[in-house]
């Protein structure tokens, strides 16, 4: 059964909003680069986080304190995701917090989580500094079989690429990976790993937009509305920005927040939907044209796994290349994406092996008859008609 985690942000009273210099709130918490802005989050009381256990009868029980994830410090949570970071078969929990350290909770297999945020290296960046984190991308960008993370942050700071070193240990490789300097002018929100060109290497997409409309009246090198970023994975080590072609979706300047990913047209290309402040959603259709192949799998869990297969890991092998994808819900920011797992296969014309590790603990291999198709796989049964 699926449980529910809700990160808390601030305790806010709309009838008594925080005002600079009043109620014990220092004026500095209501300024940005010397101009008056809305107060917070620092200086405001934080809201705790909540983990609700599924009782199986349509009700939930709040087990936050018992499980060790209640956030007694009152950090400002914005995004969260369950994923198995140490590959022990149990889902761990990550939380992106605004202006304070991030959380990584390791599942102890008994309903309790251990806070390994600092021990893992995930709490802070490589400079030992907390960042104002907004969204989390989940994926194995270097194809070493371990899940990595990309975290979006506030402007005047860089987005953070965390490489999984194993045993729930992470290294900030943002500068080595080429994703640091180019992101500093942008304020990132929704994000995800996606293989936009189907070359077999997960790329990164970032939705951007500022929180202070007044930045447009200042000469700060940033703006309220911002274009998104698409970072192409070059070799599993380094990324480069895909230039925004004129009149393309990458050149569309909006104040974005959420970003959801999926093959909306079932054509083998991952598309993006942006949630925009004070405007309609924006659909970015992937129109990349090349001869690369792909494979998409819709997974259906059996009696001992969630039906939507949350927590499943899939490994696809073509030649000497082995890719990993995880089925998860959450991450990004204020968004949920297509749960189907998508693999770009590059020039490979056949799949040698598909290995599936279900949440129940069952392991299954399926034979893929051909590439460039969407297949439905049911736990214990294999490929079935859609």
Language-model features: locations:
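Short, solvent-exposed beta-strand-terminating loops
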Residues: 8-22, 102
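Hydrophobic beta-strand segments that make up the repeating blades of beta-propeller
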Residues: 3-8, 92-97, 146-153, 204-207, ...
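Blade-edge motifs of beta-propeller repeat domains
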Residues: 17-75, 106-131, 163-186, 217-254, ...
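Extended catalytic-interface subdomain
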Residues: 7, 50, 54, 139-141, ...
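Structural signal for beta-propeller blades
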Residues: 13, 49-50, 101-104, 157-159, ...
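Beta-propeller blade termini
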Residues: 1-2, 53, 77-87, 91, ...
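Gly/Ser/Thr/Pro-enriched helix-cap/hinge segments flanking short amphipathic alpha-helices
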Residues: 178-181, 221-386
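Loop/turn-rich, solvent-exposed surfaces of beta-rich toroidal or solenoidal domains
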Residues: 147-153, 193, 197-213, 217-227, ...
